[in-house]
Amino acid sequence: LTEIAGPSRPTPYRQIPDSFAGTLARNGLELRRAETTTLQVNVGFLCDQSCRHCHVSAGPGRTEVMSRGTMDAVESFARQGAFAVIDVTGGAPELVPGIEGFLERLAPLAPRLLFRANLTALAARPDLVDLFVRLRVVVIASFPALDADPADAQRAPGVFEASLATLRVLNAAGYGRVGSGLELDLVANPSGTLLPPDQSAEEERFHRELAAVHGITFNRLYTLANVPLGRFRSWLASSGHLEDYLQQLAGSFNPCAVDGLMCRNLVSVAWDGMLYD
């Protein structure tokens, strides 16, 4: 992951948190592979933003995007896998050449096709919204905060308003509306070294405030901690926060979450066609 995310060297720190394996053992838990149900496809690191928290260091200057030949190989693999879910991510998948045809070919191969959308990149692709509706794609969009200041500080000036505009377009197409069958989920991650708040309470707050202030509706909210890799790890190291953040993550271990870890039932294809379990 460090190689994929860009050049960075491990940063020494005074106290290494207990290993994940050690934490599992201390809690009487085992991490075992379950049935593979999900194929995640990372179509590349090209993005229209350069977020400080990005764990793959995506950005406008990245040239790593999935080729048509690799897309064909992924399609062939998906046909053999009988996956319940195909999950397309990036970078900003909206910017990858040929993404429309790729989605068309993947849609019949799994009951659920997920698209992890970049709302500012999607703003320039109304054709993709029409395609999402036709293919019944589940749209999962990053929306970090309910106010412009923290959102723009994390992303870039103007991102908050541009994201709201795209959410309105998705709502107008039926996404996030009761009874439409078109699922729109949001993902919120905190700024800096904060950990996310309780997901249920935060989902209620997002539902309430987005509807009241902006007239926007959605289905689910997922709150995620920032992963200490890539550009975010570099920032943690340069700002002197890496050791404390790792300790904070280790100290916040939730044994109830182990059964739901993505690595138990997911395989991932990178932009260059490498397959990971």
What are these regions (language model features)?
Residues 1-7:
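Intrinsically disordered, low-structural-confidence terminal and linker regions
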Residues 38, 58-67, 81-96, 106-124, ...:
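Core AdoMet radical
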Residues 269-270:
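Short, acidic, Ser/Thr-enriched surface-loop or helix-capping motifs
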